[in-house]
Amino acid sequence: DTLLIRPDGTFSQEIVIPGVKNAFFKVHDGKDNPHSYLLYLAPDKSLHVDIVKKQDHIKLVYSGDTGPETDYTNIHRETVTLSQKFSNNTWRDIPDFDACVKYVDIQLAPVEKALTKVKNQTFVAQEKQGWKKMVEMLYFNYAIAKQQAGVDMRKDKDFMEFVNKINFNDTLQVAAIVPYIDWYVTANPDLYKKDEELPIGAVKIRVLGELTQDQGVRNNISKTLLTAQLFPQMLGADISETIPFVYREFLKISTDPQLREMAVKQLKIIDNTTPGTLAASLRM
């Protein structure tokens, strides 16, 4: 919807929603593309937004019932997602893992401060639950960036101490597994090449099988890894050469009945359409 501004500079909108929702709010400064913000909306709760423009800078000030949640959500988004504070170039300039931990703490301090102003304890609990996952992801992103820049993070004592504390059989620590695998295969580019040339997606699933014996974790993460390998196909990419290897590794460790059935069917289709395969009517 487009909100019309009254002659006195105010605007308002009443929105009926069934539950809590984050909505994009775009503000056009008349020059560049619209600036987008996130509004935290909740049924029967008010949110006030003051748009303050000073020269070429636009600042939004939030108040009302969900003002603190909205303020936190935008500070989090601006710090973690939109800024370059956690980009590969930034990571590569940080000398070691100990410095990385301190840097992350400093950059996330304003986000933590904004969360302390939120009185909605359900919201706070949900954010704190995801906080550890986010920080672990940032640590592994740092390790991957350094590894790609030629730094062997396996020799960083503090980083390996952090890695060795992760229990990969614990379902509560499952969020750390995918970024760990991403780093591990980056640090070990010759995995399994002595036996066979596996595509990276298949390598990741095989590493998962060696990393954890917990079947729930295996099913959860193998589904995530398989989905990541199938996603390019949705965008029109040809994955026909790599996906059979991925399916076969997936079938070795997953017990998910629906996904296993899908993988088996897809492998049969691939095998039946591979050049050089006899048509069904010609098979003896």
Question: Where in the sequence are the language-model features?
Answer:
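N-terminal "domain-start" segment that seeds a small globular fold
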Residues: Q258-M284
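Alpha-helical repeat scaffolds
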Residues: G150-K165, P199-L211, S240-L251, R260, ...
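A non-transmembrane, solvent-exposed segment enriched in polar/low-complexity residues
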Residues: D1-Q126, M134-Y142
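Structural signature of alpha-solenoid helical repeat junctions
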Residues: N120-G130, S222, L259
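Short coil/turn connectors between adjacent alpha-helices in alpha-solenoid helical repeat scaffolds
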Residues: F97-A99, N141-D152, L191-E197, Q233-I239
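Solenoid-like repeat scaffolds
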Residues: T116-K119, T212-V217, F250-S254
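Extended alpha-helical scaffolding segments
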Residues: N219-I253
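Extended amphipathic alpha-helical segments with heptad-repeat/coiled-coil character used for oligomerization
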Residues: Q129-Y192
